[in-house]
Amino acid sequence: HVLSRRQRQMCIRDRVYRSLPEKWDIILSPDNPSYKDLPGVWVLIGGLWIAHFAYWGFNQYITQRALGAKSLPEAQKGVMFAAYLKIIMPLVIVLPGICAAVLFPLLETSDKAYPMMMSLLPNGLLGLTFAALIAAIVSSLASMTNSISTIFTMDVYRAYATNNPSNTRLVNIGRSTSVIALIIAVFSATPLLGSLESAFQYIQNFTGFFTPGILVIFLVALFWPKATTLSVLNAALTSLVLSIFIFYFFPDYPFIHRMAVVFFSSFFVCYLTSLIQGYTDSPKAINLKDINFATSKAFNINTAVVVVAVSYTHLTLPTT
């Protein structure tokens, strides 16, 4: 008897479910031990969207890749290629995690799943996977250090320098900043992340202190002409102070919920500050009429393909 594709999927799902029934949950209930990290349906309709737009839309770590393109069409091609890569993320991240949970159910921490799965690969494929991992790490470090050096050199050093520094001086300052940042990262990695069950969750929690304010700043700067310098500064301070307050005084409150609360609070503070200052259009406001938001026909078609592919994946995956 030859099983159909759907039947094979059901058989695999049933075997995995019987092996670890307690892990077969997509939407967690409030009594689940992991609810603090993945608070049920709010993961899909709550604060996760704030982290999403802040990272993919306004993080220099991402946007500098598009800004480095030689033309707008080339930048759009890069963004679209990244969208196609995101479609296969379940195969790259989720599927190996499910396999690790079945093959190694007694792992002490989730971070050990990846090296354990790597140990199952044959020599040739292991080397290829390791090379890809190193390339990804180097690429991420390059983008991160470039962001750090650019922000410090152009927005801090040059802005407050007593004299007019030359380009050579700025380049040297940027390089020194990158080296110092990497040294700090090396010596702080183990104390900050070494004892954690999941470094990824910690990083998301920590960056959640800043992302709501960053998102508010960029949104009002782009689409609200009445925003002022003081209003966005107050929004940034509200984001940091309120995040720290909730983190320490309500430690069991899910950080995704916290990001949503902080985002709307920061936006309200920004609005209130602008209202107190007179609620008039800022002379530095961006004129959106001068900006061309048009996209090419190929970009629109590929966008539709990505949306259909994601929708099809969710509709056809086996569910419990």
Predicted regions and their residues:
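Terminal cytosolic tails of multi-pass membrane transporters
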Residues: 14-15, 253-315
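Membrane-helix interface "capping/anchor" motifs
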Residues: 222-233
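Central hydrophobic cores of alpha-helical transmembrane segments
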Residues: 231-242
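Hydrophobic alpha-helical segments and their helix-loop junctions in multi-pass secondary transporters
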Residues: 5-9, 13-29, 53, 98-103, ...
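Juxtamembrane interface elements at the cytosolic ends of transmembrane helices
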Residues: 46-74, 156, 272-286
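Membrane-interfacial loop-to-helix junctions in multi-pass transporters
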Residues: 36-41, 119-129, 208-213
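Helix-loop-helix junctions that connect adjacent transmembrane helices in secondary transporters/permeases
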Residues: 55, 61-205, 300, 311-315
